[in-house]
């Protein structure tokens, strides 16, 4: 596998949950809802709202405050640490993806994680040791900006030192893809392994 001669691609940004790994947050909060005998659809909706509105995903509040808000808003119950473990257990790295990352880096590309996450990402790395696969880890908990903020994409391009058109952004959420596209990034809306690998072929000669 080699980059096509006229290809300008310099870097690839991968989302974590929903791309590099299974979407553990959504799956986890739905399991928590079932355990608490609460409607999973309601808990999922509220969880995604609160992880942003409390500021937890931007590092502006701690985990205890997030779970307090969740329990008050939805009626879920349980020890905070056990609730967190339910979610973390649902983040499962797709077994084929590390090899793809390695092959892309062998072509001289910068491969980065760009994730709306909390310090849970660090805990997942302690378990699965995946940070070493990437050139950079951009986690909203530390950057203070989420992918809902279009300015984040300017920051990333500046940090990497590449023009937006030299960066491929891969995410499973259409809204994030559209924001990146408007900033000039190349994009791929992740649906499954087959369509992702097929889309990569336009950048490479096999």
Where are these regions (language model features)?
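Glycine-centered short loops/turns at secondary-structure junctions
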Residues: 106-108, 184
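C-terminal cap/substrate-recognition subdomain and adjoining C-terminal extension
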Residues: 162, 183-187, 193-206
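Acidic, divalent-metal-coordinating active-site segment for phosphoryl/phosphodiester hydrolysis
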Residues: 152, 172-185
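Short, solvent-exposed loop/turn segments at secondary-structure junctions
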Residues: 19-20, 25-26, 117-120, 143-144, ...
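Conserved acidic E/D residue at the C-terminus of a beta-strand in Rossmann-like folds
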Residues: 171, 191
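N-terminal helical cap/lid subdomain that shapes the substrate entry/recognition surface
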Residues: 3-98, 106
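Generic structural signal for small/hydrophobic residues in well-ordered secondary structure
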Residues: 15-18, 59, 104, 113, ...
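Substrate-recognition "cap/lid" segment bordering the active-site pocket of phosphatases
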Residues: 119-168
């Amino acid at each position: 596998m080699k980059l096509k001669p006229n290809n300008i691609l310099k870097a690839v940004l991968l989302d974590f949950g929903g791309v590099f790994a299974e979407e553990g947050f959504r799956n986890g909060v739905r399991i928590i809802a079932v355990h608490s005998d609460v409607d999973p659809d309601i808990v999922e909706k509220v969880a995604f709202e609160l992880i942003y509105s409390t500021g937890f995903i931007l590092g502006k509040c701690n985990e205890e405050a997030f779970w307090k808000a969740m329990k008050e808003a939805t009626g879920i119950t349980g020890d905070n640490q056990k609730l967190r473990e339910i979610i973390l257990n649902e983040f499962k790295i797709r077994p084929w993806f590390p090899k793809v990352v390695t092959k892309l880096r062998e072509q001289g590309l910068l491969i980065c994680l760009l994730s709306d996450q909390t310090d849970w990402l660090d805990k997942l790395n302690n378990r699965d040791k995946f940070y070493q696969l990437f050139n950079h880890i951009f986690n909203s908990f530390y950057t203070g900006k989420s992918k809902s903020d279009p300015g984040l994409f300017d920051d990333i391009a500046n940090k990497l030192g590449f023009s937006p058109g030299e960066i491929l952004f891969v995410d499973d959420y259409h809204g994030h893809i559209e924001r990146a596209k408007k900033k000039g990034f190349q994009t791929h809306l992740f649906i499954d392994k087959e369509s992702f690998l097929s889309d990569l072929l336009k950048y490479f000669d096999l």
